[in-house]
Design a protein with these regions (language model features):
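Rhodanese-like catalytic fold shared by cysteine-dependent sulfurtransferases
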Residues: 1-24, 32-63, 72-110
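Short, surface-exposed ligand- or partner-binding patches at beta-edge/loop junctions that are enriched
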Residues: 67-68
Length: 110
Protein backbone atom coordinates (compact mmCIF):
# COMPACT_ATOMS: atom_id res chain seq x y z
CA UNK A 1 0.00 0.00 0.00
CA UNK A 2 1.05 3.59 -0.56
CA UNK A 3 1.11 6.32 2.06
CA UNK A 4 -2.48 7.49 1.45
CA UNK A 5 -5.38 5.21 2.40
CA UNK A 6 -6.47 3.34 -0.72
CA UNK A 7 -3.29 4.03 -2.64
CA UNK A 8 -0.92 1.50 -4.17
CA UNK A 9 2.84 1.88 -3.80
CA UNK A 10 4.75 2.72 -6.98
CA UNK A 11 6.91 -0.42 -6.66
CA UNK A 12 3.80 -2.62 -6.35
CA UNK A 13 2.16 -0.90 -9.31
CA UNK A 14 5.24 -1.29 -11.51
CA UNK A 15 5.54 -4.98 -10.63
CA UNK A 16 1.87 -5.58 -11.59
CA UNK A 17 2.20 -3.45 -14.75
CA UNK A 18 5.29 -5.35 -15.92
CA UNK A 19 4.48 -8.89 -14.76
CA UNK A 20 0.68 -9.21 -14.74
CA UNK A 21 -0.96 -6.27 -16.56
CA UNK A 22 -4.01 -8.40 -17.42
CA UNK A 23 -4.76 -8.97 -13.72
CA UNK A 24 -6.10 -5.40 -13.28
CA UNK A 25 -8.00 -2.67 -15.12
CA UNK A 26 -6.03 0.56 -15.52
CA UNK A 27 -8.27 3.62 -15.64
CA UNK A 28 -6.80 7.00 -16.55
CA UNK A 29 -9.03 9.70 -15.05
CA UNK A 30 -7.34 12.59 -16.86
CA UNK A 31 -9.02 14.57 -19.63
CA UNK A 32 -9.02 13.04 -23.15
CA UNK A 33 -6.46 15.60 -24.37
CA UNK A 34 -4.04 14.54 -21.61
CA UNK A 35 -4.78 10.86 -22.29
CA UNK A 36 -4.00 11.33 -26.02
CA UNK A 37 -0.56 12.71 -25.14
CA UNK A 38 0.47 9.41 -23.54
CA UNK A 39 -0.76 6.87 -21.00
CA UNK A 40 -0.03 3.36 -19.73
CA UNK A 41 -0.44 0.62 -22.33
CA UNK A 42 -3.90 -0.94 -22.08
CA UNK A 43 -5.41 1.90 -20.02
CA UNK A 44 -9.01 3.03 -20.43
CA UNK A 45 -9.81 6.76 -20.36
CA UNK A 46 -12.66 7.70 -18.02
CA UNK A 47 -12.25 11.37 -17.02
CA UNK A 48 -13.00 12.20 -13.40
CA UNK A 49 -15.56 14.79 -14.59
CA UNK A 50 -17.68 12.00 -16.14
CA UNK A 51 -17.01 9.22 -13.65
CA UNK A 52 -19.98 9.66 -11.33
CA UNK A 53 -22.53 9.37 -14.14
CA UNK A 54 -20.64 6.38 -15.60
CA UNK A 55 -20.18 4.30 -12.44
CA UNK A 56 -22.26 1.49 -13.95
CA UNK A 57 -19.88 1.37 -16.92
CA UNK A 58 -16.84 0.61 -14.76
CA UNK A 59 -15.35 -2.75 -15.65
CA UNK A 60 -15.83 -5.55 -13.14
CA UNK A 61 -14.13 -8.88 -12.57
CA UNK A 62 -10.67 -7.52 -11.77
CA UNK A 63 -9.37 -4.83 -9.39
CA UNK A 64 -9.18 -1.29 -10.78
CA UNK A 65 -6.14 0.95 -10.49
CA UNK A 66 -7.04 4.61 -11.02
CA UNK A 67 -4.28 7.00 -12.06
CA UNK A 68 -3.76 10.56 -13.30
CA UNK A 69 -0.74 12.83 -13.57
CA UNK A 70 -0.20 13.71 -9.91
CA UNK A 71 -2.51 11.54 -7.78
CA UNK A 72 -5.21 14.06 -6.85
CA UNK A 73 -7.84 13.11 -9.44
CA UNK A 74 -7.14 9.39 -9.09
CA UNK A 75 -7.61 9.70 -5.32
CA UNK A 76 -10.94 11.45 -5.89
CA UNK A 77 -11.99 8.70 -8.32
CA UNK A 78 -11.14 6.01 -5.76
CA UNK A 79 -13.09 7.83 -3.02
CA UNK A 80 -16.09 8.34 -5.34
CA UNK A 81 -16.27 4.65 -6.23
CA UNK A 82 -15.84 3.59 -2.59
CA UNK A 83 -18.73 5.88 -1.65
CA UNK A 84 -21.15 4.61 -4.31
CA UNK A 85 -19.88 1.07 -4.97
CA UNK A 86 -17.98 -0.04 -1.84
CA UNK A 87 -17.93 -3.66 -3.04
CA UNK A 88 -15.59 -2.79 -5.94
CA UNK A 89 -11.87 -3.42 -5.49
CA UNK A 90 -10.10 -0.18 -6.34
CA UNK A 91 -6.83 1.54 -5.50
CA UNK A 92 -5.19 4.66 -6.84
CA UNK A 93 -1.65 5.53 -7.81
CA UNK A 94 -0.47 8.50 -5.72
CA UNK A 95 2.47 9.54 -7.88
CA UNK A 96 3.78 12.14 -10.30
CA UNK A 97 3.74 10.54 -13.74
CA UNK A 98 4.89 11.89 -17.10
CA UNK A 99 4.34 10.06 -20.39
CA UNK A 100 5.68 10.36 -23.91
CA UNK A 101 3.63 9.56 -27.01
CA UNK A 102 5.43 6.22 -27.45
CA UNK A 103 4.23 5.01 -24.03
CA UNK A 104 7.47 5.58 -22.14
CA UNK A 105 6.98 7.11 -18.70
CA UNK A 106 8.69 8.40 -15.61
CA UNK A 107 7.05 7.89 -12.25
CA UNK A 108 7.85 9.25 -8.81
CA UNK A 109 5.94 8.24 -5.69
CA UNK A 110 4.64 10.85 -3.26
Amino acid sequence: AGKEAGSIAVASFERIFKEAPDSVFLIDVRDPKEFDNGTFKGAINMPLSTLEKNLDKLPTGKPIIFFCGAGARSGEAHDLVKLHKPEMKTVFLDADIKWTKDGAYTIKGK
